[in-house]
């Protein structure tokens, strides 16, 4: 059993949400009718379902954890969910929008994840990312509540981002028009796949 599967085996069903309404609003702010949407790290599939309900023509959810995919298929049987390791099951430039919510902090190989996200996005397509922010207010809060619990080596979070480091990461992987804002304890980022043909506004 992989580390990711072990995390999901111990997770409550359904998984409790973190800033779910803010994250859903961020996604729906950008979904356009008729577009193809990839939910990268889909978990139980609720954001994929929200994109479909908002009018996306085709939605695919993928996750590395078999248990997550099982739950997503059970909760949303009319949508497509697949388990993946590294390469995404999609052609180059086949999606208009890639949604990656609360995933980057759990991934050791961010290079493969972001390279694949860029590969499957069409030129000018949009990547949306949410991740916990670790600017000064959060660090102070963690200090008060206990660093050890948050940075437990057996815990799920492997990486920690500030707005600056997240922006730099996306730039390094060929994204442009990058916007990062903090909302509550989370960072919300949007970025376009670099190229000549921009996504319609």
Where are these regions (language model features)?
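Conserved N-terminal segment of class I S-adenosyl-L-methionine
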Residues: 1-91, 97, 114, 129, ...
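Short conserved AdoMet
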Residues: 32, 108, 122
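Short N-terminal helix/helix-N-cap motif within the alpha/beta-hydrolase-1
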Residues: 67, 108-112, 139
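Acidic/polar helix N-cap motif
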Residues: 91-92, 109
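A short beta-strand submotif of the Rossmann-like class I SAM-dependent methyltransferase core
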Residues: 100-103
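Residue-level signal for the nucleotide or nucleotide-sugar donor/cofactor binding architecture
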Residues: 105-108, 161
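A short glycine-rich, Lys/Arg-flanked "PGG" loop and its adjoining helix->strand segment in the class I
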Residues: 111-123
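Conserved class I S-adenosyl-L-methionine
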Residues: 128-150
């Amino acid at each position: 059993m992989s580390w990711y599967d072990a995390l999901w085996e111990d997770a409550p069903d359904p998984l409790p949400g973190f800033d779910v309404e803010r994250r859903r609003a961020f996604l729906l702010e950008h979904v356009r009718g008729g577009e193809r949407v990839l939910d990268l790290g889909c978990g139980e599939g609720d954001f994929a379902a929200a994109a479909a309900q908002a009018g996306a023509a085709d939605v695919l959810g993928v996750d590395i954890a078999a248990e997550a995919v099982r739950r997503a298929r059970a909760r949303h049987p009319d949508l497509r969910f697949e388990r993946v390791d590294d390469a995404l099951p999609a052609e180059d430039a086949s999606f208009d929008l890639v949604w990656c919510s609360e995933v980057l902090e759990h991934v050791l190989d961010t290079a493969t994840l972001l390279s694949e996200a860029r590969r499957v996005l069409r030129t000018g397509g949009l990547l949306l990312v949410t991740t916990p922010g670790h600017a000064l207010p959060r660090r102070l809060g963690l200090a008060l509540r206990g660093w050890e619990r948050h940075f437990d080596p057996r815990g799920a979070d492997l990486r920690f981002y500030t707005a600056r480091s997240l922006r730099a990461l996306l730039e390094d992987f060929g994204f442009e028009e990058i916007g990062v804002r903090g909302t509550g304890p989370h960072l919300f980022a949007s970025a376009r796949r670099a190229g000549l043909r921009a996504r319609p506004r």
